[in-house]
C-alpha cells in the first residue's frame, strides 16, 4: 500500500502509542448453571492454580508470533523441505480449523443471517478479457526497482529515503542519503543509523552527529536526488529507475503454447461477482438492493511479500458486492450500515481488540478513481498499523466496464417500484482471511502469571477457537476415570464440537498445553466424578476459575458459551 509522507509518520507514531496499550486481564467468572458450585482453590490438584491472573502483556513481536504458529501447528512455510518460495504458506491442523471457523462466522454473519445476500463460488481462472475490462491487465501494477549490484528487487513505494545533514550546519548541506525499507519507526531509524554511520566513515566525518531523519517515499525523489540515493542492500546508488510490474500470475489454458492461450490467476474475487451479476439476479429472484457474497483464493505476484501472512502471494478473500440504486442521496446510508455491520463482525463476533483497531476515511486523492467513498479498518500489528478491511462505495464502474467489454446488457436493471432502468451502484466490504487470522492471533496472544509461573496463551473467542474443549481424566491408569472421560469426549464430538482428549502428564501441564493453543475450556474427570457422582470440573482458560457441573449439563453449558444459546 502506498502512504503519503504525512500518513506514514502518523502510522509510525501511532505504533508506539498502540504498543503502549497493555492487555487488560480480562478475568471473568464462569457463570454457573443451576446445580453448579465454585470450587475452592485447594479442592483438587487441578484447582491449585491462582484464579486471579496478573495483567496481560503488550502485543508480542513477529518472531514470537511466527515461532508459536509453527510450533503449535497453526502456519508453516510452504514446501519448506525444498526451501519454498517466499509469500506462500500452509495451514496446519490448528490453522486450518481457525481459518474455517473465521470463514464460517463471516458467512453466517453476512449471508446466512440476511435475506438480501446470496452466495457465489466463481472460478479462479476467467476469460482474460475480464481483466482487460476491469483494468487489471493494464493497470494492476506496483512500481519496482532493482539493485544492480545485489540483484534484489524492491517495491519503490516501500522504500524511503532521507538526506543526511550534520548537526549544527546552518547551511543544511546534504552530505548524502540513506534509504531503508518500510517498517515500524524503530526498524527504519535503526537501519538508517547503520547506513549513515557508513556514510560518515566514507566522508571522513566519523564522530559527528547528524540531524533527525526526514523520510520520504522513493517515488517522490527528484532525478538529482535519485542519482545519489543508495540501495538498502549495497549501500551504493545502484538502484534502477522505477518501472511498473504487473502483479497478475500468468498461466496458459489448453495444450497449445501461444499468446491466445494466455490466462491469469485471479488477483481478486470481486470480478467473478460482477460478471455473474445477471446470472445471480435472474436465478435467485432477488431485487435491488441485494448482495452477492464470495470467499475464495486470489493470487498476486508481490514484488516483496513480507510480514508473514499479512502480504503473501496466495491468499483468501471474503467479499460482498451489495447492489443499490444510484444517487448521491442513496449510497451514504448503505455505506454506513455496512461499516456498522463490519464492526459488529470484527469486534463482537470474532473478538478483535478494539484498542488496536482504527478507521481510516479516504477522501479526495486517497480514493480510487471509481470510488465515491472508502473507509478502511486498520489494525496495529507488531510491524505497524496497516489496512485490515475496506468498505468502499464503488459506484457502477465494474458493471459498466463489463457491459462495454462483453457487448452484452450485463448491468442494466429495471426497477419495478420506480419504473426506472439503471445500472446499479454497489457497496463492497472486502476482507482478507489471512490478514484477519494474523490480527486475531495478535489480539489473542497473552501472557500472565498463574501460580507463580509465567503463562503464554491464546485468548481466542470460543466461537472461533480451533479446539473448543479438552477432556482430561485425572489419571490415565485408572480405567473408571478413562471410561467416563472417553464417553464425554465422544458425546462432545457427536455434538459437532472439535474437542481434544489428553491424558498425558500432570493436569497442570496439560492445562498449559491447552492454554497455549487457545482451548477455552478444560473438562476434568476426577475421583469425585465417579465416587460421589459429583460431575466434572470445567476450567475457564482466561480466568483459570473452575466450576463443577453435572455431566448432563456440560453440553448445554458449552453451547451457551460457544454458540450463545
Regions found by a protein language model. Name each.
Residues 37-565:
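NTP/phosphate- and nucleic-acid-binding module
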Residues 2-46:
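N-terminal chloroplast transit peptides
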